């Protein structure tokens, strides 16, 4: 590449070295469980070697490119860095699964992608897995829920951090400095995990199960230590606790901060807070009505199962309290698909289109009709309430919003068609499964799993990756690489 194109790439490699060391450290965290379960000391062999290699690789890379630390990233190179960070994390975290000899590359990458993207679909038999590996899966969801870039910059450096954080799919920031923002987010995050763990223990969970379920509920990840998920416990208090944690994880972290600082009105007026709670309330009511006859006229049972699973779907958590989704009324089944597509809050741990975009879409439709029937053709300024302050919305904002929704739905249909074609599943089931993949949810009708075709697994891994990064980051990164490569080739040809 020519000098102009090359500028910033050495800094990317320097950051990758730093991040490689961080991934190596993450691989060591699950070994804490060996202290509590000494008989699982043999699990060390699956984590220590790859952790050492990743840390060593990162250290060498950091030394080689240390002199470039004062360089600046060029425009859109932050997107390239974020994409490469995620790819490094996914493949690095897949190594322990491969070393067990029980998983091939497709399965290991699928599990790692599901962890970091906080999806919760799995190829692991949790009834046979060691506690070290079960905790490892939860650690992946904890880190992925907070955001890989956030964890990196909050613990190490803020240089270019905010640009990367926004590129990772987070639309808001708590404070101008990402280190402070990151530490506040992690404090809120950890606070909910601690509260959730304590409540689960009080209501009868073993401490290990309580810790894992609390982590994965707040991360809206959905990995469980039980094959039956939350349904294993058949406990209403545990289900209510899970709903509370799912809501917490699905809410924008900035909204949490507004509530904590006493700014309740600002939190409630926020556009996606209204959208999220109004849509959820309506959907839960409709879900309950649609399930009453299915549960033989029991309103309480219909409310319990209808509310839990819709909230699990819309927050992108994926926990369930029934053995299977097959046989459910088709209307409710479709409602769950809609919930998975919509998603919850921007700046939360969930996936999907996100409630900010849903709210803006609904508002823009209203504005369009209102402008058309207005008596006088006047140009009106449109506003939305965003995190306690009014924000002007122009045509570009509306166009960009609809563009994202359209791209999301196109990818959803492509993925569903691939699932249906390869697995021979009905289009309804394929749409459900890929909506779960793309929305990083984790609810499943059985298309994904240990015995799934490699095409299904790789399509899922790509879908989870794109769903977590929200498409545009990936497109921008690929475009930037293509443009720089083209410019470099042209430069070389001119020299020749």
Indicate residue ranges for each PLM-predicted region:
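Membrane-proximal intracellular helices of multi-pass ion channels
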Residues: 1-496
């Amino acid at each position: 590449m020519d000098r102009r194109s090359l500028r910033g790439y050495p800094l990317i490699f320097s950051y990758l070295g730093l991040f490689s060391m961080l991934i190596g450290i993450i691989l060591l965290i699950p070994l804490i469980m060996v202290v509590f379960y000494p008989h699982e000391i043999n699990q060390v062999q699956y984590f220590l070697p790859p952790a050492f290699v990743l840390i060593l690789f990162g250290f060498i890379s950091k030394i080689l490119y240390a002199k470039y630390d004062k360089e600046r990233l060029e425009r859109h190179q932050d997107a390239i860095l974020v994409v490469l960070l995620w790819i490094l994390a996914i493949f690095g975290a897949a190594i322990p699964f491969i070393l067990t000899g029980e998983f091939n590359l497709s399965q290991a990458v699928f599990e790692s992608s599901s962890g970091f993207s906080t999806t919760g679909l799995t190829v692991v038999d949790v009834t046979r897995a060691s506690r070290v590996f079960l905790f490892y899966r939860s650690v992946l969801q904890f880190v992925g829920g907070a955001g890989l870039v956030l964890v990196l910059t909050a613990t190490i450096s803020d240089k270019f951090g905010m640009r990367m954080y926004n590129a990772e799919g987070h639309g808001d920031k708590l404070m101008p400095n990402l280190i402070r923002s990151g530490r506040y987010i992690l404090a809120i995050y950890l606070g909910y995990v601690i509260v959730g763990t304590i409540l689960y223990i009080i209501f009868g969970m073993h401490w290990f199960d309580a810790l894992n379920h609390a982590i994965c509920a707040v991360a809206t990840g959905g990995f469980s230590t039980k094959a039956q998920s939350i349904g294993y416990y058949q406990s209403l208090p545990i289900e209510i606790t899970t709903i509370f944690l799912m809501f917490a994880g699905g809410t924008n972290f900035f909204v949490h901060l507004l509530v904590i600082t006493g700014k309740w009105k600002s939190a409630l007026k926020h556009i996606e807070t209204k959208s999220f709670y109004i849509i959820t309330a309506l959907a839960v009511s409709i879900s309950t009505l649609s399930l009453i006859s299915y549960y033989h006229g029991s309103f309480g049972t219909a409310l319990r199962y209808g509310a839990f699973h819709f909230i699990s779907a819309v927050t992108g958590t994926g926990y369930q309290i029934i053995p299977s989704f097959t046989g459910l009324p088709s209307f409710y089944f479709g409602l769950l698909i809609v919930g998975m597509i919509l998603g919850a809050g921007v700046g939360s741990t969930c996936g999907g289109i996100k409630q900010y975009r849903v709210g803006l879409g609904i508002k823009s439709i209203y504005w369009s009709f209102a402008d058309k029937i207005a008596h006088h053709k006047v140009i009106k300024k449109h506003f939305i309430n965003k995190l306690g302050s009014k924000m002007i919305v122009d045509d570009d904002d509306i166009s960009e919003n609809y563009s994202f929704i359209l791209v999301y739905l196109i990818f959803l249909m492509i993925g569903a068609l691939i699932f249906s074609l390869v697995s021979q599943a009905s289009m309804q089931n394929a749409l459900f499964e890929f909506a779960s993949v793309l929305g990083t949810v984790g609810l499943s009708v059985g298309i994904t799993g240990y015995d799934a075709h490699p095409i299904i697994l790789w399509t899922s891994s790509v879908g989870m990756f794109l769903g977590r990064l929200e498409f545009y980051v990936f497109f921008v990164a690929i475009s930037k690489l293509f443009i720089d490569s083209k410019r470099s080739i042209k430069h070389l040809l001119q020299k020749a």
